[in-house]
């Protein structure tokens, strides 16, 4: 199985009892510290059987919800420090996850509570291509709508439920071939979207994180698969293959 955790430097000591004390992401002062923290966290995760870390946060820092969780105190550090965290994590046979695509750092509010909006250009997208090129294995998509953007407006839906963002931008334009996971599906930014499970999977996400009702989501996805045309079935089959390949690479199968 894939066992996951939000083991970010800024959250791990609160989330995992007995974990090795580490500095929060915004308190780190060098790329060497980033490497050391990633290795300490990964060592703890390996001891308890967690092989999928929803970290690092690669957003910019202005947003209060994610700012202290990212390396964005100095914008020039975001890409190299995130890459170091990713490489150190994956060297420990743990999947690393860059988040929150397409960018949570410059929106004003909290997607845990409600849908947030990027108005206009996607200024944080630039953080992702270098991480993709360097082999990050997973990317988490945020519950953020996009407005006034000619190519990627989401028509009021969160990015998690938008094929334009997940498939056309992340898969096709940026060329990401790894696992795409939603942010938690019980969050305020998506919970009130009707049939959000099937919308997220139809958009191209591979994994639904924490649906509010897992049984209902499973039934919804089964119905989606059985009642839709070949394009949806092909996309869902491809997601299953990506997950199986990842398990094989981790030595789980």
Where are these regions (language model features)?
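Second-shell residues forming the walls of enzyme active-site clefts
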Residues: 80-231
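Glycine-rich, aromatic-flanked loop segments that form ligand/cofactor-binding clefts
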Residues: 1-20, 37-59, 78-102
């Amino acid at each position: 199985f894939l066992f996951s955790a939000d083991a970010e430097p800024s959250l791990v000591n609160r989330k995992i009892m007995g974990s090795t004390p580490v500095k929060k992401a915004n308190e780190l002062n060098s790329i060497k510290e980033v490497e050391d923290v990633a290795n300490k966290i990964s060592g703890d995760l390996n001891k308890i059987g967690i092989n999928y870390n929803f970290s690092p946060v690669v957003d910019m820092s202005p947003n209060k919800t994610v700012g202290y969780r990212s390396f964005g105190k100095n914008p020039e550090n975001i890409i190299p420090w995130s890459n170091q965290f990713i490489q150190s994590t994956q060297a420990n046979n743990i999947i690393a996850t860059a988040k929150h695509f397409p960018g949570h750092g410059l929106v004003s509010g909290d997607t845990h509570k409600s849908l947030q909006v990027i108005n206009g250009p996607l200024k944080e997208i630039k953080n992702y291509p270098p991480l993709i090129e360097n082999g990050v294995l997973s990317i988490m998509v945020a519950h953020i709508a996009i407005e006034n953007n000619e190519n990627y407006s989401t028509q009021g839906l969160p990015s998690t439920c938008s094929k334009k963002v997940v498939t056309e931008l992340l898969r096709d334009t940026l060329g990401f071939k790894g696992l795409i996971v939603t942010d938690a599906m019980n969050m305020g930014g998506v919970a009130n979207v009707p049939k959000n499970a099937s919308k997220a999977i139809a958009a191209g996400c591979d994994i639904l994180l924490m649906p509010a009702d897992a049984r209902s989501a499973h039934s919804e996805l089964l119905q989606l698969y059985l009642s839709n045309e070949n394009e949806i079935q092909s996309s869902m089959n491809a997601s299953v293959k990506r997950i199986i390949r990842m398990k094989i690479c981790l030595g789980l199968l």
